[in-house]
Amino acid sequence: MLPAQINQTKPPMFHDGEEKLPPNNYEKANNSFVLSYARDEWLQRKLIERESEYLEFRNLKIFCGTFNANGKSPTSIDISKWLCGGEPDPSAMKDCYVCSFQEIVDLNAANVIAEGHSAKRTTQWANMILQTLNQLAPIKIHESGGRNDFGGSFDSTSNKDDWSNGNGSRESGGSGGSGGSGGSSGSGETNNNRNSNHSKSSENEEHPQHETGAYRLIASKYLVGIAIVAFIKAEHVNNVGDVQVQTAGVGIGGFVGNKGAAALRFTYGNSSICAVSSHLSAHRGAVGSRNSDYNNILNKVQFKDRHTDGNNSSSSISILDHDYVFWLGDLNYRIQVDISTEECYRRIRSNKKTEKGQNDLVWLRSQDQLNIERAHGRVFELFEEGVLNFLPTYKYIPGEDVYDDRPEKKMRAPAWCDRVLWYCRMGNNSVNTMNSGGSGTKLIKQIKYQRENSIKISDHKPVYGTFDVQVKMIVKQEQKRVYNELMRGEWVI
C-alpha cells in the first residue's frame, strides 16, 4: 500500500546499529514473512532517499503570540489588533495561529491544586480567539473533505481520527505529561479515541466551532496558569494530523504546575511542528533557575511516536525532534542585576525623546539576561530570536499604559519577560533547495516581531511573531511513480 506519510525515524529493524528482531521467534519465522519485512524496510529507506522527487515545499504563514494575563478574564478586551499583527487587511491573516498564555488564573494555592478554574479560563480564551479570527477573516465555504488550498494535488496525510475531524471536540483532560494537573481539547495525550460524530456533550459545547467560519481549533492545553491554543484555516484542515498535547510542571518541588509548560504538536503535510508555552522562574537573580526550568521542560515533554513498531512502547518524540519548534511565553529573563532599576528607567525614557535613546535601548538589550545566556550557550542554544526592537513588556500598571514605578509599590526594573523563539531542525538558516536548482527560500523566516500596546488589563504587554514556514507536501502522482519504480526494480537488504 502506498504510504501517505514517510516516517523518517530509524527503520524499526535496527536500533543503534544492533538488529532488532521482528515479533515472535526469528529462527522460527516463516521465510516469506522475513523477506516481506526486509523488503518493506528497504522500500522505506529508498522512498526517503528519493523524497526530493515527490515532495514539494509550500509556504505556511504562522502567527505566534504570547501574553501573561495577570489572572484577568478576557471577556472585556479587544484582541483583534494583537491577532492582526498591525495588518488589518483580511488578506494578511495567517494560516495558523498559536497563542500562549501565562497566569490565566491567579497562582494561588486553590488554583494550583484544583483545575476547574483553569479549564474554564482556557475555554474563554480559546473561544474569544476563535470568534475574533472568524470575524476578521473572510469566510470561505468548504465542502467536507474538499480540496486543500494548494489546489488539491497533494496527499492529505492527516488522519481524521487524529484530531476529531478537525473540529477540536473536547476530551476530558486529566493529568497531563510530567507533573501538575492539566486539561486538553482537540487531542489528548493518552486517549486515541476520537469523537468523529461531533456528539453534543456538555464538554463539546464549551468549544463552539463556528463550522461556517474561516478557522478551526486544532488543540488546546492548560497547566494551572499556563495555556496554549492553536487554530488553522478551514481550507488547511485536511493537511493536519497527529495532533498531541503534553505538559511539564517544573515549579514547587520541580514538578508542580505553577511554573512549567504546556505544549502541542501536529503534522502539516510531511512536516512536523511543535509549540511550547512556558512560564519560567521569576525574580531578577534567578537566572540559573530559569535555565534549569528550560532544560527540565526539554527533558519532560515527550510525545508518542505513532509511526514506530507497535511493540516499542517506550518510543517517543522530544521537542527538538520536530522540523519546526516555536517556544513562547513569559520566560521571565530580566535586565542584569548589577544594573539599577533607576538606570533602566532612565535608559527607557530617554529612548522616547532623543536619537541617543535608540542607542540606550540597544545598550539595554545588551544587558538582557536571555541574550547573555544564549550567547554563552547556556540556554536555548539551538533557538533563534528576532531583535527586540520594542520597549520592555514588563512591568506596567494594569489598566494604564505606563510602567509601574510607583514609590509605594515594590519597584521592578522593566524587562523583556515575554518572548518568542524558534528552531528549525535542518538549521535556522537552512534554505529550500528542493526543486529549485540549488537555491531557494529560507525554511523559516520571521516576518515581524513586536509587542501589542492596545491590551492593558495586565502588568505585561502581549508579544507576537509572524513567520513564513516552508512545509513539505507529498505530490501523489510523483510518489506513486517512485513507488512503482522501486517495486519493479531489484532490491537488496
Predicted region positions:
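Short interface patches used for recognition in eukaryotic signaling and trafficking proteins
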Residues: L47-I48, C64, D106-A119, T212, ...
